[in-house]
Regions:
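Patatin-like phospholipase
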Residues: 2-199
Length: 199
């Protein structure tokens, strides 16, 4: 239950900027063994003994460590109080993720709040997927980018106000991997309300 002012302060903070850029706050460095800097997206590994060629393509542009630590700090208290039941939060909560393992939409209503929120905003290529209950999860917008159906089904709502913050998708081009993948995997924007009352 963060107030609008608290949320605005978080979104305007250096910590939030670090989440989006992957820059790790100095206070977290002792959690990791420092590795040699490598900005490559693609690595080619050769095993000379067996002459095996195994290409490796990185699944993320931005490292998620800062986001994971920040979410741990922000949501651990709520996890503890709610006993991992999102209906027991001050405001009951749902979020939608994409279960990559089974190729389907998954509505998260329990478990780790930080993991659920992380999954629901993990866009392919930008962040690497998160594993929940053994399955890889990405942003739920791949299957359902306006989940009013979930809200109508799980909650007794009187009225829904839905806001689309999506921008029109760029046309895919031959030399832009991001726009090509975005057009392939993200469901076209839809704003259908499944309840009787709403805008």
């Amino acid at each position: 239950g963060y107030s609008p002012d608290e949320m605005e302060a978080l979104f305007c903070s250096a910590e939030f900027e670090n989440m989006l850029t992957g820059k790790l706050d100095d206070k977290y460095y002792y959690f990791f063994k420092k590795q040699e800097t490598n900005s490559a997206w693609v690595q080619l590994k050769f095993d000379l003994d067996s002459a095996v060629f195994s290409p490796y393509l990185s699944l993320n542009i931005v490292t998620p460590y800062q986001m994971d630590f920040t979410f741990l700090e922000l949501f651990s208290k709520s996890d503890y109080i709610s006993k991992n039941n999102f209906d027991s939060l001050f405001i009951p909560f749902r979020c939608v993720a994409t279960d990559v393992t089974h190729g389907k939409e998954l509505v998260l209503d329990s478990g780790s709040l930080k993991d659920a929120i992380r999954a629901s905003m993990t866009f392919p290529i930008y962040f690497n997927p998160i594993r929940i209950n053994g399955n890889l999860m990405y942003d739920g917008g791949i299957f359902n980018n306006f989940p009013s159906d979930v809200l109508c089904r799980d909650f007794d709502v009187d009225y829904i106000i839905g806001v689309s913050v999506a921008k029109p998708q760029e046309e895919p081009t031959e030399d832009n991997l991001i726009t090509t993948l975005t057009n392939m995997i993200v469901e076209k924007e839809q704003d259908k309300l499944f309840c009787k009352e709403g805008i």
